[in-house]
């Protein structure tokens, strides 16, 4: 426990930068009942293009439920989700968003990486797919079956798909699960690439190092309620650190 405390205390945020763009995504009074239980309770937030927002909280806090609701997989919610001032129903949210699950293997369907990058896309841009694979260092594996790739390569494949699929909102569930430190830093760098493309990015994670390396903002959920929402600046790092230290002591 003490070793973890020292290590966490030394990590510094390296992705933080003020985002001066106008918010394009708005969540207003979002609530959701699941099996007669209130699992999301009056959430309100906005996000601008290029933001990388870490979603933190203990198990059962509502992180995954919020993510699935945001991308249209939960439909029985109240409140509003708007994109550029226009309210989105569940079907529209599906069109706007792309979610990468914790185990990427379950959403790799094509028989080659090259085909995976354009899978399910009408009129795909093959040049864009090639450029994405080249940019992410996986072009040499384009003829390989996606499930033969390493964990880090699969994550890069998922990022390549997110670059090609023309979605505005990207949601990642534990993207560094099972990755070593070097691979985690590589994934953090890939998120910076997506940020520069103007994507709105949400990341559900329990990885303190990844939050510090990749995210510009943190939203803390607990029992379906929004507890904190803050920029991940050096001045706010203690808030993130305190959350993880409390979690370790539970």
List each model region and its residues.
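Conserved ABC ATPase signature
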Residues: 145-149, 153
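Catalytic Walker B motif of ABC-type/P-loop ATPase nucleotide-binding domains
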Residues: 170-173
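Conserved ABC ATPase "signature" region
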Residues: 126-141
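H-loop/switch region of ABC-family ATPase nucleotide-binding domains
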Residues: 205-206
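Conserved ABC transporter NBD signature motif
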Residues: 79-93
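Helix-to-loop junction immediately C-terminal to a conserved catalytic motif
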Residues: 71
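Conserved beta-strand-loop-alpha-helix hinge in the C-terminal portion
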Residues: 1-2, 225-248
């Amino acid at each position: 426990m003490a070793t973890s405390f020292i290590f966490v205390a030394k990590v510094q945020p390296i992705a933080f930068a003020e985002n001066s763009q106008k918010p394009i995504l708005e969540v207003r009074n979002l609530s959701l009942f699941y099996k007669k239980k209130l699992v999301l309770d009056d959430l309100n937030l906005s996000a601008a293009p290029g933001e990388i927002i870490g979603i933190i909280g203990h198990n059962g806090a509502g992180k995954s439920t919020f993510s699935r609701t945001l991308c249209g997989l939960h439909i029985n919610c109240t409140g509003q989700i708007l994109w550029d001032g226009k309210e989105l129903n569940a079907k529209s949210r599906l069109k706007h968003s792309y979610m990468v699950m914790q185990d990427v293997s379950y959403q790799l369907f094509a028989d080659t990486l090259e085909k995976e990058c354009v899978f399910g896309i009408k009129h795909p841009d093959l040049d864009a797919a090639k450029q994405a694979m080249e940019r992410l260092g996986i072009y040499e594996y384009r003829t390989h079956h996606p499930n033969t790739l390493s964990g880090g390569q699969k994550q890069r494949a998922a990022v390549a798909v997110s670059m090609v699929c023309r979605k505005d909102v990207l949601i990642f569930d534990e993207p560094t699960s099972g990755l070593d430190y070097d691979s985690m830093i590589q994934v953090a760098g890939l998120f910076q690439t997506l940020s520069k493309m103007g994507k709105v990015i949400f990341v559900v994670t329990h990885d303190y190092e990844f939050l510090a390396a990749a995210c510009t903002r943190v939203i803390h959920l607990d029992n379906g309620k929004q507890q904190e929402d803050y920029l991940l600046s050096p001045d706010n790092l203690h808030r993130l650190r305190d959350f993880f230290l409390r979690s370790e002591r539970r």
